[in-house]
Amino acid sequence: MKDRISFSSDYTKGAHPLILQRLQETNFEQITGYGTDDYCKSAADKIKKSCNAKDADVFFLVGGTQTNQTVIDMLLEPYEGVVAAQTGHVAAHEAGAIEFSGHKVLTLPSFNEEPQFTDKEKPCYSDQVGKIKGADLKKLIDDFYADDNHEHMVFPGAVYISHPTEYGTLYSKAELEEISGICKEYKIPLFLDGARLGYGLMSKRTDVTIEDIARLVDVFYVGGTKVGALFGEAVVFTKGVPVKHPVPVIKQHGALLAKGWLLGLQFDTLFTDDLYMKISKNAIEMAEILRNKLVERGYQIYIDSPTNQQFVVMEDDKLKELSEHVSYGFWEKLDDTNTVVRFATDWATTVEDIDTLFKYL
């Protein structure tokens, strides 16, 4: 609705103006399809340069769930499943897309840790972080192979993590190195979901770079849908493509766009003059302002998120009033009278947007 402001997610707006400009400029060009065009090649080259992985293979897919399903299916044998946090997107919010492709999601509990953000009056309500721990991953694999009946069970064939996580939290470089080392030890590929990758990379509290990710994982993707593109995700296989013919597999999963240059052109724009990182930084700066204002108003921060997703505990009566003017994301019911909600900033959020939000908070 036009008279409501939205902080419900980071994909409620169209695309960065420079992308729209380039789409307009090239609108009447006649371009080859399915990602075989020069725009896709240029975008792939820029992405490979940004992560210092000149031998990587890059493919442009249409959306996040299609990407997760396609990549995981590429990585696994028919008798294998993918290990993920029980809070992971593939385990909780993809309508069984992984299972629909014939693979089980083998869940691990996400662990808790002491929040870095603290407020003496109201510290973070939860210490949930939505990440998997290396030790838990190793135990799952060891326990599987220690079971005499493991030939009759779903094999752990790949590991899925996201950065940022569903809770907006981040893996440290040490955590990624530990998980990567375990995956290498057991010859299991590591897949990093980067739907919000830009927001993770530009967080003020990260020591992880895109070069680190390319070095430590077997495949990751650069999210466009939530970070300035109209749609699309750029999949980067850093250590070789796991199937002989990837394009037909991508097509089988409904993730191959006939007008593939529309994806390539967008990512070529995002990876020109560091635009992807610049607009991601805006979301982080706006989230910091939002969080500080929430604390000043006395609201209870729920999770210590250093990225663009901010989670807050609100009274249900207040939410009824707020919902008339603001779209927010429902997260979970905390108790009979309180709810956890998510406010998400994005690449285009302004200070004026936040000021408008706080007229109703």
Language model features by range: what are they?
Residues 82-104, 111-112:
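Substrate-binding/gating loop at the entrance of the active-site cleft, primarily
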Residues 16-64, 85-91, 97:
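Conserved N-terminal alpha-helix of the aminotransferase class I/II PLP-enzyme fold
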Residues 74-92, 116-125:
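Conserved PLP-anchoring active-site segment centered on the Schiff-base-forming lysine
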